[in-house]
Structure formats: structure tokens, C-alpha cells
């Protein structure tokens, strides 16, 4: 192993991530009481141009008036992208007026590490001037070919500028690639396998190398729960920590898939016990149920046990 190890920047439980349009305040209370681990109030794609200013006011009110953290939620706001004239006001107005209640900001269409730096610099100034006692984190959407081409640099340099998590924005990524698909997160039957696997894997490796949380993005057809679960299983198998829910019906599906089964947790604990006993006897490896286990097995087992502990409120994952 290299002598350089990048520890996780910030650990949060993020199995399910509920998207809530900032222009629909009637949905805020429902999101607060939902089973989602993470909620983001959206000022970007879910809000029509004529509604942007009103949506921003709605989001500020929701952050000020509702106790998101007290209801077990990580609360975030997706601002508009840097190439729009909305982004500056999104950051300044939301953070100055309600930043004390905000956990993270979700930056869409991140293309380079400098995009993260720009947002971080704005947050530094606002937090200092307002005297905030906590630091707001940054999460980015990788949803363009430029962002995917620079994903390693974004993770590497972004971690020094508040970056906590990356999300795979499959819809805009598909458009950027000119992929032949019209269902958000859906698969083209002419492609053998999962056409998003390469992008997901590339982003995942960058995240894990530099201690950033990898989060899978949306699946558009909320009337097709089985396909949603299939996509979530693929992400979980790769090592993602959670998936978006663009409809409340998808929350429990994400929670189910990204919660390790009891049998998996039990087996992981058995691995750790067996290796602990082997270590006491001076052995680096052991056998469990007819299979060899070693230090690598312990690391995989610890990941499962830590996730289970976080879900049950014992420790942070």
C-alpha cells in the first residue's frame, strides 16, 4: 500500500437521497417526515426559469422553519450551475439567510476542479462574514463528459475545498455523450449490459481514492420499481453508498438495497471474530466455512459492519 492514504473527508449516511423541487413548498413537510437519509431542495432542473426567484425564497423559508437535522435528515440545496446567472444569487441569498441550517450545497454540472474552488471561495467569505460555527460541505454532480474526463482532479483537489461527495447525473451525462436513450437511468436494449457501468466505475474509483462519497443518481421511471432496484443493486455491488429518489416511492427501495442484509452483517462479524482469533494464535489468515479469509477479508467485513452500525445509529459509517 502507498504511504499516501486519503481518509474520508466526511462520513454521512446517504442510502436514499430525495429530490424536492424548490417551487413546491407543499412537498417540504412530507420530505421532512419521509424515510430519506438525505434531502436536497432543488433550485435547478426541477424549477422553471420564471419560478427561480420564488423557489429560492421557498428554500430559505424551509431551511429556517423546519428542523431537518432534528428529524434525522442531512439537508442540502442544489443550486444552479456556474454557467447560469442564477448561481451567484442562489449561493449568496441562501447561505447568508439560512446557511446555519444547511449541511451541504450540491453543485450541478461540475466540469473542473476550479468549479469547486469557486463555490468554496464564496462559502469561505460568507461563513466568515456571518460568523457561522460550522462549515458547509460541497457535493458535485458529474453529469458531463468534461466532468467525467476530469473526475480524478475534481476528487483530488476538491477534497481540499470542502468536497464531500460526487453524484452520477445520468440524464445530462447521457445527453453529453449523445447516448441513445430517453429514459433517465434506463438501459438501451441494443447495448450488451449496463451502458452506464464505465462512467459509474470511473467516478467510483476517483471517489474512493480520495475519500469522497460516491452516490448514484436518478432513475426516471418511478412506475417501474423493479428496474429501479436492479439499477440500485448494480450501484451497491460496485461500492456506491446510495441512490437518488425522485419520487417518494423510491425512498424505501433505495434504503432496502443499500442496507446490508442481516445474513451479510452476520457473516462479516464472523469473519472479524475468526481473524481476531487467528491473530491471537500468530496467524494472518484463517478458514471460515471452508474458505480462506485474510486481512483483505477483514477490510471488506469492516465496511459492512460499519454501514450497519451507522444505520442503527451506533457510529457514523
Give, region by region, the residue ranges found by the protein language model.
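Expand to "…catalyze enediolate/carbanion chemistry for C-C bond making/breaking, isomerization
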Residues: 1-317
